[in-house]
Amino acid sequence: MPTSNQSIRHGREKKRRTDRTRALEKCPQKRGVCLRVSTRTPKKPNSALRKIAKVRLSNRHDIFAYIPGEGHNLQEHSMVLIRGGRVKDLPGVKFHRIRGVKDLLGIPGRKRGRSKYGAERPKSK
């Protein structure tokens, strides 16, 4: 505990907040190239094979990004757009792919939540 004299002389140090998406460098999205596409199992108590990919961003950062939705067409050297947003049950995965942009196709035939998955508007009869 500092004395009152020490508090006056030195003041209080501000707490520094850590940046969770440091690789984006304060940008809303970044472009990247897939290095490897794989699956990973989530933490307890969940069970699945979550699709992830290792991506090298345009600023030379290597990150893991989650591929949302059912099915994908990604492979090595695919160009993708990355946004922030972690996956709660996958440690170390702090980014999401944006579907329907660059080489990652949207989900065909999706009717609900289309904007999140890059799906086209269904034709009305």
Swiss-Prot record:
Compositional bias ranges of the Basic residues kind: 9-19
Cysteine-cysteine disulfides: none
Cross-referenced PROSITE patterns: RIBOSOMAL_S12
Signal peptide stretch: none
A GO MF term: structural constituent of ribosome
Keywords, alphabetical: Mitochondrion, Ribonucleoprotein, Ribosomal protein
Function description: Protein S12 is involved in the translation initiation step.
Similarity comment: family membership: Belongs to the universal ribosomal protein uS12 family.
Entry protein name: Small ribosomal subunit protein uS12m
Source species of the chain: Pinus sylvestris
